[in-house]
UniProtKB/Swiss-Prot annotation:
F-type ATPases have 2 components, F(1) - the catalytic core - and F(0) - the membrane proton channel. F(1) has five subunits: alpha(3), beta(3), gamma(1), delta(1), epsilon(1). F(0) has three main subunits: a(1), b(2) and c(10-14). The alpha and beta chains form an alternating ring which encloses part of the gamma chain. F(1) is attached to F(0) by a central stalk formed by the gamma and epsilon chains, while a peripheral stalk is formed by the delta and b chains. It is a peripheral membrane protein. Belongs to the ATPase delta chain family. This is ATP synthase subunit delta. It is found in: Cell membrane. F(1)F(0) ATP synthase produces ATP from ADP in the presence of a proton or sodium gradient. F-type ATPases consist of two structural domains, F(1) containing the extramembraneous catalytic core and F(0) containing the membrane proton channel, linked together by a central stalk and a peripheral stalk. During catalysis, ATP synthesis in the catalytic domain of F(1) is coupled via a rotary mechanism of the central stalk subunits to proton translocation. This protein is part of the stalk that links CF(0) to CF(1). It either transmits conformational changes from CF(0) to CF(1) or is implicated in proton conduction. Keywords: ATP synthesis, Cell membrane, CF(1), Hydrogen ion transport, Ion transport, Membrane, Transport.
Length: 270
């Protein structure tokens, strides 16, 4: 694919949380279908990544082409991705693919919270491990003569999962790896889901171990703050001096004495 600009490659991203409440496996499936359309149509791909067109114009083009033909959430996501400047023509398809995985993860989250995300990661890694152990299965999925439908049928026979989201991502990886290897793509899918799973884990560092009552109060406070039942992990770090440090996903709450002293030093220029 031709280069759209000389800008360095970076992932196109959207805030999936904007649509998380409405996320379903079907919306993720439609996003994957849109990836296939973009990959297969060079003229469309160039139009949606053309740096001479404004982001608003590219987003309007998405709505013109897809409104009424795909789920409104899927169309809005693709329009927002297309409105961003792409460094390469492939970048848009990559961004839609990644977002499709995150929408599938959000659908699992809606169904079963952090436990469903953990199970989804396990399903993906388990299937990848099965692939790694069997050269025959690898050859079956890499056989260019086999249809996508045949590969999906084989994946359904081999994947022992009751999760619609896991089935979707596994079938996608083996039937449309977009130039990658199915196992490698499954590993990438699992990493994206695992990144989202971090939103359900609170990593707590304290200068001294907390008692059971303190942990219970902290758990309750964090659950109320984030609006979900977090999994708490604790670690003692004497260098904090006092207080505690909590990380949930990429957000950090630092109430340690060390951090407060550092802030004071910054304010006074020490």
């Amino acid at each position: 694919m031709a280069e759209a600009s000389n800008e360095p490659y970076r992932p196109l991203t959207v805030d999936v949380d904007r649509w998380a409440a409405a996320a379903t496996p079907e919306i993720a499936h439609q996003l994957f279908e849109i990836v296939d359309i973009v990959d297969a149509n060079g003229a469309l791909r160039r139009a949606l990544t053309d740096p001479s067109r404004s982001g608003e114009d590219r987003a309007r083009l998405v709505h013109t082409l897809l409104d009424g033909r795909a789920n409104e959430v899927a169309v809005d996501i693709v329009a927002e991705l297309a409105s961003q400047r792409s460094a390469t023509e492939r970048q848009l398809g990559d961004g839609i693919e990644r977002t499709a995985v995150l929408v599938a993860a959000a659908a699992a989250e809606n169904r079963g919270g952090g436990h469903a995300l953990e199970a989804l990661v396990d399903d993906l890694i388990r299937f990848k491990s099965m692939l790694d152990r069997s050269a025959d299965v690898q050859r079956a999925f890499s056989d260019s003569r086999a249809s996508a439908e045949a590969k999906v049928t084989l994946a359904r026979r081999l994947a022992h999962t009751e999760s619609d989201e896991a089935a979707l991502l596994i079938e996608r990886a083996v039937s449309a790896p977009r130039g990658s290897l199915p196992g490698r793509l499954l590993e990438q899918f699992a990493q994206w889901v695992a990144d989202r799973q971090q939103r359900w884990i609170a990593r707590v560092e304290t200068a001294r171990p907390l008692g059971e009552e303190q942990l219970a109060r902290l758990q309750d406070g964090l659950n109320r703050l984030y609006g979900r039942d977090l999994k708490l992990t604790t670690e003692t770090n004497p260098s904090l001096v006092g207080g505690l440090r909590v990380q949930v996903g990429e957000e950090i709450i630092d109430g340690s004495l060390t951090h407060r002293l550092g802030q004071l030093q910054q304010r006074i220029g020490a």
